[in-house]
Amino acid sequence: MQKFSRDSFNVNEAINELMYESGVIVIENAYNLNDIKEAREIVNHFADTEEQKETHFNAEAEALKQIKLQQRIWNLFGKGDIFSKLISDDIIFSLMSKLLGSEFFCGSYCASRLLPGSLGQELHIDYPYWDFYNSETFPMGLNSSFAQNCQATIPLDIFSEVSG
């Protein structure tokens, strides 16, 4: 995993790390804390006031009656202008354009709120082939010579077992 700061970000080094090395990069301090605080407040508001919308791949949490400790907030574009600001950051756009091509699009934009004690999600990969265990469902010749998907995670809180 390669780490960058906003000032040290290099799109070519990032692409190399994503495609040929670990597949993961971290960009530290990419956003200002006021924007993160605003986004967190909106996510928490909707998580507290909307009907429960669970995440996928959470059979264990459901079986243990802990499903209420995790919630998905969908359609962030419609929840506040701050979410458009965050996702349209130059670093994200330069990286996604180079990795996926200039006509890439956002297939989903949501927040996953995990409260302390949450089990999180079962291991999976997202679209286009989430079930990495059933190779017979893959098209012939599937390989990683080009990217089909990329995910950006914007943490609104510090990740830890205690925080969820």
Task: Give residue ranges: language-model regions.
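Double-stranded beta-helix
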Residues: 145-153, 158-164
